């Protein structure tokens, strides 16, 4: 459950370290984002020499949430942190590596490139 003002870690090597959610995309009344949803965020911390700088406004897809997500079989999955991956306007990841596990719900949402780069899919 990511909403406005939520801080997220960045799970790729795009140069950003942490994000602040500005907006959840997908309708004017949409308040929260889950795994696989796209948000607009501001870069709050960045590594020197990275592709993005502090203060840049970027789009990101949520790959891990602390709030549990219910699956079709009745099981739940949750992670220890909120994390996102920066994406371009066409939905492809901006970084070349993904760090940490990602949820398999991303495959159903069409983010196969993120799935293939991730070291572990839960």
Swiss-Prot record:
GO terms for biological process: translation. It comes from the Bacteria. GO terms for cellular component: cytosolic large ribosomal subunit. GO terms for molecular function: large ribosomal subunit rRNA binding; structural constituent of ribosome. Keywords: Ribonucleoprotein, Ribosomal protein, RNA-binding, rRNA-binding. InterPro entries: Ribosomal_uL14, Ribosomal_uL14_bac-type, Ribosomal_uL14_CS, Ribosomal_uL14_sf. PANTHER family: 50S/60S RIBOSOMAL PROTEIN L14/L23, LARGE RIBOSOMAL SUBUNIT PROTEIN UL14M. Part of the 50S ribosomal subunit. Forms a cluster with proteins L3 and L19. In the 70S ribosome, L14 and L19 interact and together make contacts with the 16S rRNA in bridges B5 and B8. Belongs to the universal ribosomal protein uL14 family. NCBIfam families: rplN_bact (TIGR01067). Binds to 23S rRNA. Forms part of two intersubunit bridges in the 70S ribosome. This is Large ribosomal subunit protein uL14.
């Amino acid at each position: 459950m990511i909403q406005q003002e939520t801080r997220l870690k960045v799970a790729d090597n795009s140069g950003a370290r942490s994000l602040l959610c500005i907006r959840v995309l997908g309708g004017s009344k949409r308040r929260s984002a889950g795994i696989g949803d796209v948000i607009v965020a501001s870069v709050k911390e960045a590594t020197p020499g990275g592709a993005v700088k502090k203060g840049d406004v970027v789009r990101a897809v949520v790959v891990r949430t602390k709030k549990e997500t219910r699956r079709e079989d009745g099981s739940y999955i949750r992670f220890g942190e909120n994390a996102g991956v920066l994406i371009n306007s066409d939905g492809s990841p901006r970084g070349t590596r993904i760090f940490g596990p990602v949820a398999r719900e991303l495959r159903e949402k069409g983010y196969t490139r993120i799935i293939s780069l991730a070291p572990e899919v839960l």
